[in-house]
Regions:
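Conserved phosphoryl-transfer catalytic core
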Residues: 64-119, 123
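A general structural motif
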Residues: 24-25, 158
């Protein structure tokens, strides 16, 4: 995920320098975690990772990728008739995401503030997302929030779904 200040391209070099200089340790504090690239790299290497950032999107990514250490089961959500089984081999996360992708798009905050149609009244309409992608993001975000409010998501399942939405939304920036 590209983000101002993202260190993804320099992480391997940073690690090489630490090894070359003989700087050893098994824990890392990522002060400006952002997209969690540094934290994820060191977590994969078995480090104990602590991370921090002021941005809420980063907090969601940290909860999903750094704090979370288990595969989500969605045990409260999957038994409901609204989330039908796809294939027996589909993971619980895949089944939930498939359901979310089938929802009928509706206008909301992202559509009204970050799409050409939603901001037609501005002298320069915003084009961060296509109209359709803006609606889809709104629909999925609202459904995730309803599930959270209805106590249908356990542990970090809420953050895993938000992190998935953040990641896929990023890939659709300016996708017209």
């Amino acid at each position: 995920m590209r983000y101002i200040g993202n260190k993804e391209n320099v992480i391997p070099r940073m690690y090489e320098i630490l090894i070359h200089k003989g700087i050893a340790g098994r824990s890392l504090f990522d002060f400006f975690s952002g997209t969690t690239s540094v934290s994820k790299f060191y977590k994969r290497l078995g480090y104990t990772v602590s991370s921090s950032d002021f941005m809420y999107f980063s907090y969601c990514l940290q909860k999903a990728y750094i704090e979370n250490n288990s595969t989500p089961t969605f045990e409260r959500l999957l038994p409901l008739p609204i989330v039908s089984p796809l294939k027996s081999c589909a993971s619980p996360l895949d089944r939930v995401i498939a359901y979310l992708n089938e929802l009928e798009p509706e206008e909301g905050f992202i559509y009204n503030n970050y799409t050409p149609e939603g901001t037609y009244h501005l002298s320069q309409p915003r084009m961060y997302f296509s109209n359709e992608n803006g609606k889809k993001i709104d629909t999925i975000r609202q459904q995730i929030e309803r599930w959270k409010n209805d106590n249908l998501l356990l542990g970090n399942e809420y953050y895993i779904l938000l992190a998935s939405l953040i990641a896929v939304s990023y890939t659709h920036l300016r996708a017209h």
